[in-house]
Amino acid sequence: MSYALDNLRLLIAHDSQDEAEQLMNALRNAGRATRAQLALGEDDLLRALKGGAWELMLCRPTFGDSSFESVMSHLNRLGKAIPVILLEDNFTPDTIKAGMSLGARGVVPNDDRDLL
């Protein structure tokens, strides 16, 4: 029996290319075929949002010249329904509530690949 794996179309809004690669590798090591694009700032983000069909987005609170709040604003303005997971350094109940209230589908600690 054979079946094809579907690629997860992933957009990563991050300020570190190395850490973004680690995120992609964590998903691949978990058995998920992943096709990803990295947005290092707002210009990259807007090009990616306008030019691609994304299934999931991983986002840092700030990256380059942009922020999570800006990401959510662009998604709403462009009518994109992409689930966003916020990768938070300061993982507390307050940051979870704040991220979720701004529209994140989930909030995970930036350094915990198992929760991702």
Give names to the regions the model predicted.
Residues 38-40, 88, 109:
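Short loop/edge segments at beta-strand edges and connector loops
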Residues 1-37, 43, 50-51:
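Non-catalytic signal-transmission and effector/linker regions of two-component phosphorelay proteins
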